[in-house]
């Protein structure tokens, strides 16, 4: 309804300081024209897609990518792609992935922002490897190409004794897998095991190994840009290897220095802040890593300490115990000016490095020789044990056959073992057996027969009637029922002696009474109990001693 106005024809809403909405003039109209389709500016924007889901285009038709297929595909920049990884164990008809069918996961070694590393055992050759799997699936073609660059960098490095060996890579279900050799641990873990600094000889060995690995990269115009103890791996033979080439840059490639990224700020060269990427940056990072492990020093991430190290000032309280030759090497590697900083070739030409390299070669030769000797010794021991078992197989089989044919014999001192008497009774309890005659329990026919015969030996004897009337120590518990079928089967299986005949079923049937619970258990009269020979208990032995 229309809003009433005043004498001037103005409504109260016109005098309010609040601006009147644009649609208020249309509110007084009873009818309005039909609105046509509004423009895109009046519609709500579409909701953003989930980051973990595949990007779906709302304009172009959804194209199925080859890498989005669930089937595994080999990734290599040397050979044609879109091939299934070569393995005899993989079956495409199964629902499991290539990783689960061909590898046995042992444990998780670590996790980073780009992937997680697992220690696995190959089911094809039985060797142990390290497999790095990407944390998140491919979000698109650009994200996939960015992650596949790490595979190309590993193939670009090639094989070298001081670089982590790359085995193969594949993609499956929009996830990237990289298989490399397995090492014993990283240099950071190795240095943390020591209470203080590493020994000088060990530091020289690490320096020689890493300089040779860095020379291999620089000869191929490759920059690592992330050298630190966490990215240096130690093999099981003690050789240090450079790894984690995710930030590596090719100087003569298409990337150039525009796509380069600096690594950890604790080991970063000062010229990287100005965007200058050169081989000298890796030399500075290697010097900072050696300073940390040699002096057991916590490197600063920033502040005055970070500036002092970049200005060539080495703290004397940490470097006073270092050898002079090694301190000279560190000073040359940590030169603030990258143009005057030492190169890898110049460092390898130093007399101290050459001397340490000769000792390193002798040490590695000794370790390899010792490893081969141990392997040959283990093979000989295994071969001798196999031949010994093969020759003694007929003898072991004959002894096993004789052991099965031999009858068990019981010791003569205990003709009534407890396990023999307890095994013939059922473990069920009878509610009617809890009566007044608990201590006066007649023996069962099966127990009577076992007392008379035991493995073919005659056990009939005489004893005092008053001693037999006393309850034994084992008869003070509530009697348990005997299964009729089980007792008949046991009774028929017992051996007989010439002097003692089998108890007839007629005699046992006469002593049973259907009105009592003892009749169902197969108990006999008490007169039979007095004529049997029972094992002596402590109470009987005490009475015999008092009578004498």
From Swiss-Prot:
Q: Which GO terms describe its biological process?
A: meiotic cell cycle; negative regulation of G2/M transition of mitotic cell cycle; negative regulation of G2/MI transition of meiotic cell cycle; regulation of mitotic nuclear division
Q: Key word Protein transport present in the record?
A: no
Give binding positions for Mg(2+) 2: 246
Bias regions of kind Low complexity — which residues? 507-521
The record gives the membrane topology as:
Peripheral membrane protein
- Family annotation (Pfam families): Pkinase (PF00069)
Q: Which reaction does it catalyse?
A: L-seryl-[protein] + ATP = O-phospho-L-seryl-[protein] + ADP + H(+); L-threonyl-[protein] + ATP = O-phospho-L-threonyl-[protein] + ADP + H(+)
Region annotated Disordered sits at 61-89, 464-523
- Please list the residues that bind ATP: 109-117, 132
Name the catalytic site residues: 226 (proton acceptor)
List the Gene3D superfamilies: Phosphorylase Kinase, domain 1, Transferase(Phosphotransferase) domain 1
* Polar residues composition-biased segments: 63-85, 472-481
The residues that the entry says bind Mg(2+) 1 are 231, 244
Q: How does it assemble?
A: Interacts with CDC2-CCNB1 complex. Interacts with Mos during oocyte maturation.
Q: Which family does it belong to?
A: Belongs to the protein kinase superfamily. Ser/Thr protein kinase family. WEE1 subfamily.
- This protein's domain notes: The membrane-association motif is essential for the localization to membrane of Golgi stack. According to some authors, it is a transmembrane domain; the existence of a transmembrane region is however unproven.
Q: What does this protein do?
A: Acts as a negative regulator of entry into mitosis (G2 to M transition) by phosphorylation of the CDK1 kinase specifically when CDK1 is complexed to cyclins. Mediates phosphorylation of CDK1 predominantly on 'Thr-14'. Also involved in Golgi fragmentation. May be involved in phosphorylation of CDK1 on 'Tyr-15' to a lesser degree, however tyrosine kinase activity is unclear and may be indirect.
- Protein name (database record): Membrane-associated tyrosine- and threonine-specific cdc2-inhibitory kinase
Higher taxonomy: Eukaryota, Metazoa, Chordata, Craniata, Vertebrata
């Amino acid at each position: 309804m229309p809003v009433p106005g005043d004498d001037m024809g103005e409504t109260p809403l016109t005098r309010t300081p609040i601006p009147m909405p644009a649609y208020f003039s249309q509110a007084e109209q009873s009818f309005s024209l039909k609105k046509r389709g509004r423009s895109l500016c009046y519609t709500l924007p579409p909701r953003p897609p989930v980051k973990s889901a595949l990007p779906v285009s709302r304009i172009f038709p959804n194209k199925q990518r080859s890498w989005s297929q669930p089937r595994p595909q080999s990734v290599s920049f040397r050979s044609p792609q879109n091939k299934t990884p070569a393995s005899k164990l993989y079956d495409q008809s199964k629902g499991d992935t290539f990783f689960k069918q061909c590898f046995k996961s042992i444990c998780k070694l670590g996790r980073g922002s780009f992937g997680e590393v697992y220690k696995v055992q190959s089911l094809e050759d039985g060797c142990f490897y390290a497999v790095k799997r990407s944390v998140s699936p491919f979000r698109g073609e650009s994200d996939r190409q960015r992650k596949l660059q790490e595979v190309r960098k590993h193939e670009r490095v090639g094989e070298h004794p001081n670089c982590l060996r790359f085995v193969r890579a594949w993609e499956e279900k929009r996830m990237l897998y990289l298989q490399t050799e397995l090492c014993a641990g990283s240099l950071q873990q190795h240095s943390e095991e020591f209470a203080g600094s590493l020994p000088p000889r060990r530091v020289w060995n690490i320096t020689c190994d890493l300089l040779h690995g860095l020379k291999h990269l620089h000869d191929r115009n490759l920059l690592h840009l992330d050298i630190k103890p966490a990215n240096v791996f130690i093999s099981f033979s003690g050789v240090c290897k450079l790894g984690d080439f995710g930030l590596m840059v090719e100087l003569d490639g298409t990337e150039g220095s525009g796509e380069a990224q600096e690594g950890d700020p604790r080991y970063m060269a000062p010229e990287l802040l100005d965007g200058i990427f050169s081989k000298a940056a890796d030399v500075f990072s290697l010097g900072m890593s050696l300073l940390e492990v040699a002096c057991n020093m916590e490197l600063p991430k920033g502040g005055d300490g970070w500036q002092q190290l970049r200005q060539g000032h080495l703290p004397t309280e940490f470097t006073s115990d270092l050898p002079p030759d090694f301190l000279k090497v560190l000073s040359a590697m940590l030169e603030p000016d990258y143009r005057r900083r030492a190169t890898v070739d110049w460092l390898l030409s130093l007399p101290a490095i050459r001397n340490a390299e000769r000792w390193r070669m002798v040490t590695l030769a000794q370790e390899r020789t010792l490893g081969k000797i141990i392997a040959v010794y283990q093979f000989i021991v295994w071969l001798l044990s196999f031949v010994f078992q093969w020759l003694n197989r007929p003898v072991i089989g004959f002894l096993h056959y004789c052991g099965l044919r031999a009858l068990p014999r019981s010791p003569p001192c205990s003709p009534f073992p407890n396990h023999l008497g307890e095994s013939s009774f059922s473990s069920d309890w009878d509610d009617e057996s809890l009566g007044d005659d608990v201590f006066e329990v007649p023996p069962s026919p099966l127990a009577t027969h076992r007392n008379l015969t035991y493995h073919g030996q005659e056990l009939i004897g005489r004893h005092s009637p008053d001693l037999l009337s006393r309850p034994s120590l084992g008869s003070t518990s509530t009697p348990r029922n005997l299964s009729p079928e089980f007792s008949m089967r046991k009774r028929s299986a017992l051996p007989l002696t010439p002097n003692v005949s089998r108890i007839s079923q007629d005699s046992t049937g006469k002593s049973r009474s259907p009105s009592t619970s003892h009749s169902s258990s197969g108990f006999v009269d008490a007169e039979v109990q007095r004529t049997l020979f029972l094992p002596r208990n402590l109470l009987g032995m005490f009475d015999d001693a008092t009578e004498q």
